[in-house]
Amino acid sequence: MDHAEENEIPAETQKYLVERPIFSHPVLQERLHVKDKVTDSIGDKLKQAFTCTPKKVRNIIYMFLPITKWLPAYKFKEYVLGDLVSGISTGVLQLPQGLAFAMLAAVPPVFGLYSSFYPVIMYCFFGTSRHISIGPFAVISLMIGGVAVRLVPDDIVIPGGVNATNGTEARDALRVKVAMSVTLLSGIIQFCLGVCRFGFVAIYLTEPLVRGFTTAAAVHVFTSMLKYLFGVKTKRYSGIFSVVYSTVAVLQNVKNLNVCSLGVGLMVFGLLLGGKEFNERFKEKLPAPIPLEFFAVVMGTGISAGFNLHESYSVDVVGTLPLGLLPPANPDTSLFHLVYVDAIAIAIVGFSVTISMAKTLANKHGYQVDGNQELIALGICNSIGSLFQTFSISCSLSRSLVQEGTGGKTQLAGCLASLMILLVILATGFLFESLPQAVLSAIVIVNLKGMFMQFSDLPFFWRTSKIELTIWLTTFVSSLFLGLDYGLITAVIIALLTVIYRTQSPSYTVLGQLPDTDVYIDIDAYEEVKEIPGIKIFQINAPIYYANSDLYSSALKRKTGVNPAIIMGARRKAMRKYAKEVGNANIANATVVKVDAEVDGENATKPEEEDDEVKFPPIVIKTTFPEELQRFLPQGENIHTVILDFTQVNFMDSVGVKTLAGIVKEYGDVGIYVYLAGCSAQVVNDLTSNRFFENPALKELLFHSIHDAVLGSQVREAMAEQETTVLPPQEDMEPNATPTTPEA
């Protein structure tokens, strides 16, 4: 036996013994002394807010310009090699993705290069993540393309009698203007949200929602790329059912497919799939992943130029890539009223994708990212970038994994990648003018593999949470058929409705005691758990507020089987039977107390003559009900206390407090005490502010724990038994007397 086993304490001897008073709320408060809270005056707060100290200035600079904090602490010898390798690896991937995602955005390819340069440089200064790769992203590019195609469709008539070539250029110029306007507006939205500290909005985009949305976006991207892969000419669609129209259009024109274009695309597709599998299998042995996309671009460009595929076989190619950077231009703000819905969706989706990947990599490497500053950084990248003809950017998942996986330590790796793009823009762009669009299509489709793998979420959510499965499926279906903008809005609404549903339909549990312990567990779950005679313990795992207060009251009566209306009805029957037996017509016609209560959500007040079948187990209440009438009551368990477990209730509103007050009175009218156990400070404050404790004696109903409430109930009943034994019976007790409401 090893040392650990020799010193191991048998489980049956691991016990704890506690001896203390029964803590009702007043008793516990007598033992506690509230700390004096020293609050600053308004003048002191204003003075502190407007006082300028070197430390405060430094912290503001660090917050708004994170580069001023991490760059001076840059460990050159440790970081430079990793950043160098990572920057080159990310740059060679960013080039083909920039060209390909420009096709998704419905703008000329060179604008994808601009979007891969300017925002990356700006994010290096303002971003808080050290590892994510900022630039064009398939989902955001597709959303931009949807707006551009909606406002500037393929069949738009350009005034001026231009020829086909010039007409295409004019159409593309209009689409660039639309993309710039959407980008500027989405950037302004992100910046304003960040300044107003609205970074928390990302929490409303739950993981099932984001994954369902990106999966639907992957289907949209896939269908958009098919026409380039097959080399067919089809109209580009946007809006509701656009994915269906795009697929049908490709299938209708498949007889006109370009075999050469398809062959080149499939060759690159196979090369990338096999190469990525090789990279994944040998990633531990490779110093860096093989830049397959870059090799595909070089190979595709070489084959296209060598065999003159564009002229000889009508293969569509990238076309002219003008050298040099364009001068700044003002986006057309007059389009804002046409694109604001899309801009909001793009701003939120772009931020959500960025912050989720940033947090994932930050947790892996042990540092913090600031959601509000990320919003500001993205807002600056998009709003200022739009002046230089960029379209909306976000975090690219595939590039971020490459940048982190190849040893990147800081955003200097991203800067190096953007400098490689700058080299292409200024000097070598013309080399890629012969690149077939089918190659870019294959690159995009292969990079969708990770998103399509998210279909494996379905069996996981089926096993773990049907509600999250519903969110995933509804998000996917709505985004697939309604379009990404309205699909996202629909998905957020559905996600919020599930939050309401969870609180409106919580789980209700009747608890029992594990014998000889202070442990109380679901009585239906374990055989060892037993109910305490005379006591019902009822638990809810949600707040009690206007949406579920009536359901809570009904569930309490249904699950515990203790319904005041049924109890009162049983007493009426007992009095009628007693009156019939003794022939006392005065008793039979005596006035009884009418009780308004709910049975299964309906008004349970009934006339005396009604004799409906009792739906709940017969229960006799231990009260001052006349002893000579007890034999007429149905046999059942004597219930004297109902304990409401509030340990999982985090707040109550005024409607919930009124419902609780009604429950206390309703049960009190039939002689049953209602105790509240485990109330948090917030719940006590809610009860106090809603005047639940107008009668101070009601505070005696509050107990620190379930066990305190159980012991308090048992002590109260024991004392009542002693009083009954000592005191003579009351001779003048009226048969139809109603027991008074129990007092704490």
Curated annotation (Swiss-Prot):
Spell out which residues lie on the membrane's Cytoplasmic side: 1-75, 127-137, 197-206, 277-291, 360-370, 407-410, 465, 505-744
Residues of this chain that stay in the membrane without spanning it are found at 242-253
Q: What is the effect of changing residue 104 to C?
A: Is accessible from the extracellular side after extracellular application of thiol-reactive reagents
Quote the entry's note on domains: The STAS domain mediates dimerization, with both STAS domains latched onto each other in a domain-swapped manner. The N-terminus domain is involved in dimerization such that each N-terminus domain embraces both STAS domains. The STAS domain harbors a unique anion-binding site important for the fine regulation of the high-frequency electromotile properties. The transmembrane domain consists of 14 transmembrane segments organized a 7(+)7 inverted repeat architecture that can be divided into two main helix bundles, the ''core'' domain and the ''gate'' domain.
How does this chain assemble?
Homodimer. Interacts (via STAS domain) with CALM; this interaction is calcium-dependent and the STAS domain interacts with only one lobe of CALM which is an elongated conformation. Interacts with MYH1.
Q: Where is this region: Extended region for STAS domain?
A: 505-718
* Annotated InterPro entries: S04_transporter_CS, SLC26A/SulP_dom, SLC26A/SulP_fam, STAS_dom, STAS_dom_sf
Reactions catalysed, as given in the entry: 2 hydrogencarbonate(in) + chloride(out) = 2 hydrogencarbonate(out) + chloride(in)
Which stretches of sequence are listed as region Disordered? Answer: 720-744
**What is the regulatory mechanism acting on its activity?**
Salicylate, an inhibitor of outer hair cell motility, acts as a competitive antagonist at the prestin anion-binding site.
Query: Where does the protein end up?
Result: Lateral cell membrane
Q: What CDD domains does UniProt report for this protein, alphabetically?
A: STAS_anti-anti-sigma_factors (cd07043), STAS_SulP_like_sulfate_transporter (cd07042)
- Which family does the record claim for this protein? Belongs to the SLC26A/SulP transporter (TC 2.A.53) family.
Swiss-Prot/TrEMBL site (Contributes to anion binding) positions: 399
In this UniProt entry, which residues form the Extracellular topological domain(s)? Answer: 105-108, 150-168, 231-241, 254-258, 308-332, 389-396, 432-436, 482-484
| Organism the protein comes from | Rattus norvegicus
- Kindly provide the name given to this protein in its UniProt entry: Prestin
Query: Reported effect of changing residue 399 to Q?
Result: Fully abolishes anion-dependent electromotility-related charge movement
Consequence when changing residue 389 to C: Is accessible from the extracellular side after extracellular application of thiol-reactive reagents
Q: Which Pfam families match?
A: STAS, Sulfate_transp
Coiled-coil intervals: none
Spell out the molecular function terms from Gene Ontology.
Answer: bicarbonate transmembrane transporter activity; chloride transmembrane transporter activity; chloride:bicarbonate antiporter activity; cytoskeletal motor activity; identical protein binding; oxalate transmembrane transporter activity; protein homodimerization activity; secondary active sulfate transmembrane transporter activity
Q: What effect on the protein does mutating residue 399 to S have, as reported in its record?
A: Does not affect anion-dependent electromotility-related charge movement. Abrogates salicylate inhibition of electromotility-related charge movement
Indicate the annotated site residue(s) for Controls the electromotile activity.
398
Q: What is the effect of changing residue 485 to C?
A: Is accessible from the extracellular side after extracellular application of thiol-reactive reagents
